[in-house]
Curated annotation (Swiss-Prot):
Residues 3-53 form the Kazal-like domain. It is found in: Secreted. It comes from Pternistis afer. The record marks M15, E16 as: Reactive bond 3. It holds the Pfam family Kazal_1. Disulfide bonds join C5-C35, C13-C32, C21-C53. Glycans are attached at N42. This is Ovomucoid. Its main location: secreted.
């Protein structure tokens, strides 16, 4: 399972709630929040699955 984060980071994310679960076992509210965290982690954070952790 993967997410294309090539257009991130973005300065602001919408409040849209479409949860994704990161490899850090944290539920991110949407792809934007998740991708910003991926960029911040220098690519060490990956997608575990779609939906809550």
């Amino acid at each position: 399972v993967s997410v294309d984060c090539s257009e991130y980071p973005k300065p602001a994310c919408t409040m849209e709630y479409r949860p994704v679960c990161g490899s850090d076992n944290i539920t991110y509210g949407n792809k934007c929040n998740f991708c910003n965290a991926v960029v911040k982690s220098n690519g060490t954070l990956t997608l575990s699955h779609f939906g809550k952790c």
